[in-house]
Swiss-Prot record:
Its main location: secreted. Keywords: Disulfide bond, Hemostasis impairing toxin, Secreted, Signal, Toxin. Disulfide bonds join C27-C38, C55-C151, C126-C143. Residues 34-152 form the C-type lectin domain. Belongs to the snaclec family. PROSITE patterns: C_TYPE_LECTIN_2. Expressed by the venom gland. GO terms for molecular function: toxin activity. It comes from Crotalus adamanteus. It is found in: Secreted. The keyword tRNA-binding does not apply. This is C-type lectin 9a. Interferes with one step of hemostasis (modulation of platelet aggregation, or coagulation cascade, for example). One of its GO terms (cellular component) is extracellular region.
Length: 157
């Protein structure tokens, strides 16, 4: 009986060590992992430029969040729900660089826009996720307004 328990326990340890979480990286304490990136919502309202600067100071490669899929949008929306401030918007890393442009050609992290989720009639200036759409749709808001935000960075493996 003792041998059976010992062997069973040994097999359980081997199974758990091999199964893992599917992630080959660890995010710092307080950060959440999704698809090879670390994310964290911040309650301290900042304007868009200051929020982007703050994110870049948190970790190498840190920026305001870029959103590249429906799955990532859902994940970020869940993080946004954790923000304590009752603000209508939270910043994301998308901003029009010139008044003549309809939309920015890239996110603040330099990645191309391959996924869009504009709220109806919105596609200009600084973008935020709006509480009215459960933080799933993107809306324009004044770049100087102070809003909570979500940072994202690729961890070093």
């Amino acid at each position: 009986m003792g041998r059976f328990i010992f062997v069973s326990f040994g097999l359980l340890v081997v199974f758990l060590s091999l199964s893992g979480t599917g992630a080959d990286f660890d995010c710092p304490s307080g950060w959440s992992a999704y698809d090879q990136y670390c994310y964290k919502p911040f309650n301290e309202p900042q304007n868009w430029d200051d929020a982007e600067r703050f994110c870049s100071e948190q970790a190498k490669g840190g920026h305001l969040v870029s959103i590249e899929s429906d799955g990532e949008a859902d994940f970020v929306a869940q993080l946004a729900q954790k923000i304590d401030k009752p603000d209508i918007y939270i910043w994301i890393g998308l901003r029009v660089q010139g008044k003549e442009q309809q939309c920015s050609s890239e996110w603040s992290d330099g990645s191309s826009i391959i996924y869009v989720n504009w709220n109806k009639g919105e596609s200009q200036m600084c973008q935020g996720l709006t509480r009215w759409t459960n933080f799933l749709k993107w809306d324009y808001t004044d770049c100087q307004a102070k809003k909570p935000f979500v940072c994202k960075f690729p961890p070093e493996c």
